[in-house]
Swiss-Prot record:
Keywords: Amino-acid biosynthesis, Cytoplasm, One-carbon metabolism, Pyridoxal phosphate, Transferase. This is Serine hydroxymethyltransferase. One of its GO terms (biological process) is tetrahydrofolate interconversion. Homodimer.
Length: 429
């Protein structure tokens, strides 16, 4: 018998699993689910191990199999991205960002990036990572009509401020940033260019979003668990050979010691699966995002950037100020088992009072949903926003999800493999 308090915690985990995997429509743009195979190999002994240092140069013994996996994972990502340097040791996208800033920007240096209301991530801003490293920030200007960076005004900002680093990419990211144009301007001013690819990394691997390294960026940073449906983790990929040592030292010993080694095998599985299934998956994700946006507009819940076709990524952004704002709407949708997040939009006076919500279709696409299902999701959302009791919508959402429980775009597993993994960990004999 387990102690009661442990039974209670286990029950919470099981209830959560059932709720999020089987009963909700998850539209959080920064989340996803691993394939069954990736999730299986994520359960491994490396979860309790250390491997400080780099492949072949560790501060601990017992790392020969860690070295093997990290080496093949690094090389496979380098080939996929056309990078001369890849580091899979950062434990998150933010840690990857911080390490890159530390390596490329001198103390007291200047970074040009987007503020949060224009889609920049908090780690690109002085409320987050830049403040921690005491770096200065200049804002990249925004063109509301194009819902993108204003290249002409950005040229003036970069030429006048002469930043050490220009950051592109973001957390609200509907359309590819003008990477090539900004990279040319930045390089002429002596700045490095970093593209935070966390949200669109799976779309890059899947070939439906431009590869920033081929567009002129010096560095890609990313997480490995959004449109790239792997375990939570981070990655740096670069084409700056003169800064490799600085990047390596920034990752360790400055910002990490333990790299959460158990994620390596699952990340490798995910990369191989994306090589096999990623092109179709990425194409479907972008199609579904556009379909959801169009269906929401038909339901009287119009997303932003209609004139531009709403989106070219996995994301849809909706101004819900007339429905009570982002806080209220996100909470009300959760009552109906529709999970979204509140999000600031470019015209908001304060990011603490966001007028919008952000939706992402990558996880529901992973469960096999297509354009028809996006139209059904739009109807569920519209019912809640029109004032219908969320409890009734919740019942319909749970019933709807029953047909979409199998994770697609990955390899299958069988009981024999599950038994091998469990026995290798002595979970049973």
């Amino acid at each position: 018998m387990l102690p009661k308090e442990l039974e209670e915690i286990i029950d919470v985990v099981l209830v959560h699993n059932n709720w999020r995997r089987r009963e909700t429509i998850n539209l959080i743009a920064s989340e996803n689910v691993m394939s069954p195979l990736a999730e299986l190999v994520y359960l491994n002994d490396m979860a309790g191990r250390y491997a400080e240092g780099t492949v072949g140069n560790r501060y601990y013994q017992g790392t020969k199999y860690v070295d093997l996996i990290e080496d093949v994972l690094t090389k496979r990502f380098a080939k996929a991205l056309g990078a001369t340097y890849v580091d899979v040791r950062p434990v998150s996208g933010t840690v990857a960002n911080l390490a890159t800033y530390f390596a490329l920007v001198p103390e007291g240096g200047v970074v040009a990036s987007l503020p949060v209301k224009y889609g920049g991530h908090i780690s690109h801003n002085t409320v987050g990572g830049l403040k921690a490293l005491r770096l200065k920030m200049v804002e990249l200007p925004w063109d509301l009509d194009r819902f993108n960076i204003d290249v002409d005004r950005a040229r003036k900002v970069i030429e006048e401020a002469k930043p050490n680093l220009v950051i592109l990419g973001g957390s609200l990211y509907l359309f590819p940033h003008p990477i090539r144009e900004i990279a040319e301007i930045a390089k002429a001013s002596g700045a490095y260019v970093l593209h935070d690819s966390a949200h669109v990394f799976g779309l890059i691997i899947g070939g439906v979003f431009p590869n920033p390294l081929k567009e002129g960026a010096h560095v890609i940073t990313t997480s490995t668990h959004k449109t790239f449906p792997g375990p939570q983790g981070g990655l740096i990929a670069a084409v700056v050979e003169d800064k490799v040592n600085d990047l390596q030292r920034a990752v360790f010993p400055v910002f990490t010691s333990n790299y959460h080694l158990h994620r390596y095998a699952a990340t490798y599985v995910t990369l191989v699966e994306m090589e096999h299934f990623g092109a179709e998956y990425a194409r479907r994700v972008v199609e579904n995002a556009r379909a959801l946006a169009e269906a929401l507009a038909e339901q009287g819940v119009p997303p932003v950037a209609e004139a531009l076709g709403y989106t070219r990524t996995h994301q849809v952004a909706v101004d819900v100020s007339k429905f009570g704002g982002g806080d209220k709407v996100a909470a009300k949708l959760e009552e109906a088992n529709i999970i979204v997040n509140k999000n600031a939009l470019p015209w908001d006076k304060s990011v603490l009072k966001p007028s919008g919500i952000r939706l992402g279709v990558q996880e529901m696409t992973r469960f096999g949903m297509g354009k028809d299902e996006m139209r059904e999701i739009a109807k569920f959302i519209a019912r809640v926003l029109s004032g219908e009791d969320p409890a009734g919508v919740r019942r319909d959402v749970a019933e709807f999800r029953k047909a979409y429980l199998e994770i697609k775009y990955g390899f299958k597993i069988d009981r024999e493999l599950v038994d091998k993994v469990f026995k290798s960990l002595s979970l049973y004999t």
